[in-house]
Amino acid sequence: KGHPMGGYGGALKQLSIGIASSYGKAYIHGCGNPDEIWTANHDHFLEAMADAAKSIVDYFGGKIVYINIMKNMSVDCDCCAVAEDPCMKDIGILISTDPIAIDQACLDLVYQANDPGKKHLIERIESRNGVHTIEAALELGYGSRTYELIDITNE
């Protein structure tokens, strides 16, 4: 799904904003200064999400399984008061032990989709520099952009 600030909402967004308390959400959105919740530098916000996600990964010692459901994909997140209707057909469910790899795989599947609605979601992702969260997480060293897709629909 898309996200109004992060560009997309996947494992990294859920590890950071999704798990955070109200104060934690403000802290992340404000890049360490909750008083700047809506005025902080946008790329710094994406980096703060990657950093917050790392704290959860570190806390659990990597003992997390990530499940991204690519269904009812809209340019908006369910955190929006009124989200746009889905713009893409369902793609599937991805599972990984690497939050960076699963988010990269999801973005790749959106870009590769044979779906005219993808242009709306891609526009949201790119206009918010959404891939920067993946880049920042990779720089922090808690995952990889490399993955192997295994299709189990015919097994």
Label each PLM-derived region with a short phrase.
Residues 1-155:
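Extended, low-polarity segments enriched in aliphatic/aromatic residues
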